[in-house]
Regions:
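Short cysteine clusters
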Residues: 46-49, 54, 58, 93-97, ...
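A conserved FAD-binding loop/helix module that cradles the flavin
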Residues: 293-298, 303, 440-471
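FAD-site-proximal beta/loop scaffold in flavoenzymes
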Residues: 250-281, 374-444
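C-terminal catalytic lobe of FAD-dependent flavoproteins
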Residues: 23-37, 41-45, 356, 360-414, ...
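Glycine-rich Rossmann-fold phosphate-binding loop(s) that bind the pyrophosphate
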Residues: 149-153, 288-290, 439
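Beta1-alpha1 glycine-rich phosphate/pyrophosphate-binding loop at the start
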Residues: 5-32, 61-73, 78-83, 109, ...
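Feature captures the FAD/FMN-dependent oxidoreductase FAD-binding
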Residues: 78, 140, 145-149, 197-246, ...
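Ferredoxin-type iron-sulfur electron-transfer modules in oxidoreductases and energy-metabolism complexes
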Residues: 23-42, 63-95, 99, 110-140, ...
Length: 484
């Protein structure tokens, strides 16, 4: 450790956000760049822990103290080598991960944690800027072929690992471009898509083949996959959204978040001039208080919504870590995202009872009621009903598992009791040679878990194809975040 007193002498400073009145007029990323000297001081706050609990918070097993120290010393090339040793895509996690490593940071027991996420992101951006992110093509090919179905973070991680191991890998994606939720689910103001494209370019040069616009299960059947490939990795995600079947659900103007967000991204990239779901001048209500709801909020603001209200059935979290969620667990606290900084009209402890129409089949308002948690369930507070006028409702209430698609039926893979694709300790499904990685097997989770799943599943596939593997396997299928 280069600065033994850094955590005591240097205060925690996170990157500043661009002014609200400026950033809501464009789709560019929210955060402003910082000087490298500032970054070095932040890296110097990493203390000489006996046991670095930040490792506990990250399923990738990132070597956090090592690359923190290297960045403090200015050894950027060695820092990116240590970072890439455990994480294929630090430019994604450095932007999109909620950083459970920071809530597990030892400094965070009684001080402000090290800005690990900020240091990670700057490490990879310095490497790209200096031309130090190069293709790592295999020395030889094994003659084995692998199909990866789905091009989100789990699928891309599995594909890159298997390609580098010498297998011939094809990644299939039903959307018109590769990237999965990274492409069309994550708004441009959180991650500009050229960030994704430059990594895909590296993967193509390594030998990974991309097949966008292919609906596997229809255009390419499960039988076709079995005949053409020696192994298949299902990385189709948890895309079956949770719905709200209440009176008025059929009214026009009610959409799932993932029906809205892709069009926002296409608009941001200039791929469409007038998206079919456009909230300019309209009143919007978002159901769900999580990250996806915040993404709908930021997108609605940039489209020019007249008002946006976000509803959450849970009570407002506390500002400080609850006593029942001690360090090093990830606490449920009140957070203000960049979108909430732009327009924060959140309502907690409320439930939607009915969608109200205008008599012409269009949405005009929603009927809500205050709730309280009693007898193990949420109960309505009598006399607390009210209406919120709105033209659009976006449901951002999470996902229940992978879609029960024709591909799953064709491959005859079994599902577990939660509706996810069943798998063994080697990430293999109930059908030999068919593996599953990411949310399709785990259930909806964080991007770091998706990448860890992709890396671990790749190791299992490599072992299945060759009888051995040197690929790292950071997690088991049954591993879960530390909870209380």
């Amino acid at each position: 450790m280069a600065d033994p007193k850094g955590f005591m002498t240097t205060p925690r400073e996170t990157p500043k956000r661009r002014p609200v009145d400026v950033r809501i007029k464009d789709w560019r990323e929210v955060y402003e760049p910082q000087s490298f000297e500032h970054l070095q001081k932040q890296a110097g706050r990493c203390m000489d822990c006996g046991i670095p609990f930040c490792h506990n918070g990250c399923p990738l097993g990132n070597l956090i103290p090592e690359w923190n120290d290297l960045m403090y010393r200015g050894d950027k090339e060695e820092a990116i080598d240590r970072l890439h040793a455990t994480n294929n895509f630090p430019e994604f996690t450095g932007r999109l991960c909620p950083a459970p490593c920071e809530t597990a940071c030892v400094v965070g027991i009684n001080r402000d944690a090290v800005t690990i996420k900020q240091i990670e992101l700057r490490t990879i951006e310095e490497a790209f800027g200096a031309g130090n992110v190069k293709p790592l093509a295999p020395d030889r090919l094994t003659g084995k072929t692998v199909a990866v179905i789905g091009s989100g973070p789990a699928g891309l991680a599995a594909a890159q690992q298997l390609t580098r191991a010498g297998h011939t890998v094809a990644v299939y994606e039903r959307a018109d471009k590769i990237g999965g939720l990274l492409r069309y689910g994550i708004p441009e103001f959180k991650m500009e898509k050229h960030i994704l494209d430059r990594r895909l370019e590296q993967m193509e040069k390594e030998g990974t083949r991309f097949r966008p616009g292919v609906d596997v299960g229809n255009e390419l059947t499960g039988s076709d996959l079995r005949k053409k490939y020696d192994a298949v990795v299902l990385a189709v995600g948890s895309t079956q959204w949770r719905d709200l079947s209440i009176k008025g659900r059929e009214l026009k103007g009610i959409y799932q978040a993932m029906e809205f967000l892709p069009w926002g991204n296409k608009q941001a990239l200039g791929e469409v001039e007038a998206p079919p779901i456009n909230v300019a001048g309209k009143h919007v209500v978002i159901l769900g208080g999580g990250d996806t709801g915040a993404d709908c909020l930021g997108t609605s603001i940039r489209q020019g919504a007249a008002s946006v209200t976000q509803l959450e059935i849970m009570p407002r979290p506390t500002d400080e870590r609850p006593s029942g969620q001690p360090w090093p667990t990830y606490p449920m606290i009140y957070r203000v995202s960049s979108a909430h900084e732009e327009k924060d009209n959140r309502m907690f402890s409320v439930s939607t009872e009915e969608f109200l129409g205008d008599g012409q089949g269009n949405l005009r308002a929603i009927k809500i009621v205050e709730t309280q948690f009693a007898n193990g369930k949420f109960e309505a507070v009598p006399g607390s009903e009210k209406e919120i006028p709105c033209d659009f409702v976006f449901m951002a209430m999470g996902f229940t598992g992978p879609e029960k698609s024709s591909l799953i039926a064709q491959l005859e893979v079994e599902l577990d009791e939660r509706g996810n694709i069943k798998r063994d300790k080697e990430f293999q499904t109930t059908e030999e040679g068919i593996f599953v990685a990411g949310d399709a097997g785990r259930g909806q989770s964080l991007i770091v878990w998706a990448i860890a799943e992709g890396r671990s599943a790749a190791a299992s596939v490599d072992r299945y194809l060759t009888g051995r593997t040197q690929l790292p396997s950071p997690i088991a299928p049954t591993d879960r975040p530390l909870m209380v």
